[in-house]
Amino acid sequence: MPTFRQQLARMFHETHSFKWDKTKGFTLASGQVSPFYVDCRVLMAHPSARRLVGHLAHEALMGVEMDCLGGLEIGAISIATTISDFAYAADSKREWRTFVVRKQAKDHGLGKLIEGAIRPGDRAVIVDDVLTSGGSLLKAVASARQAGLVVGHALVIVDRKEQDGRIKVEQEGVKVISLLTIDDLTSAQ
C-alpha cells in the first residue's frame, strides 16, 4: 500500500497538475524557465487530492501551536480551508481559523489587506502551494506580521528546491514544512 505522500505525488500525475517539458519548459512567476510546472489549483479541484493534502498537513502540523492559517490569494484559500476542515474533523479541539492575504488592500469597504478570523497575537501558519524563490511566502509573512500575527511556520504542498526559496524564508525566522518536493513528483509515475 503506497504511503499518503506517494499517493499525493501520484495524484499530481493523475490530475495533470504536474507538467514536464524538457525542451520548451515553462516560465515561472520569477521569470525563470523551468522544465517543470506544478499546478496546485488543478490539484486542489479534486476532492481526493484535498483529502490527501488535509491528512498530510494535519500530520505535519501536529506539534505546531497555532490559532489560524492562511496565505496569499487565490491559491492559499483552498489549501487553508482544506487543512482547517480536516484538522477539525480529526479533532474538534483543533479549530484553526483561516484567513487570506490580498495582493493589495481593497479600495472600498473596510480596505483590508487580510480577510478572515484573525486577532493580533494569534499564532499563524502561512500556507502556499509551491515554494520556489520564497517571494509569495515572504509577502504573506510580512503582511501577517504587520497585522499582528505571530508567524513561525509555513507549509507548502511542493518545495521545488530552487532559487534558495527555503533558505530565504527560514532566514526570516519561519520554519518551512513541505508535504512533497519536486523529487517526489519526478519520481512518481
What residue spans do the PLM features occupy?
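Short acidic, glycine/proline-enriched helix-loop-strand junctions
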Residues: 63-64, 79-96, 167-182
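Active-site-facing substrate-recognition patch
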Residues: 1-65
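PRPP-dependent phosphoribosyltransferase catalytic core
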Residues: 2-14, 142-189
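Short, glycine/charge-rich flexible loops or terminal/linker lids adjacent to PRPP-binding catalytic cores
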Residues: 79-125, 135-138
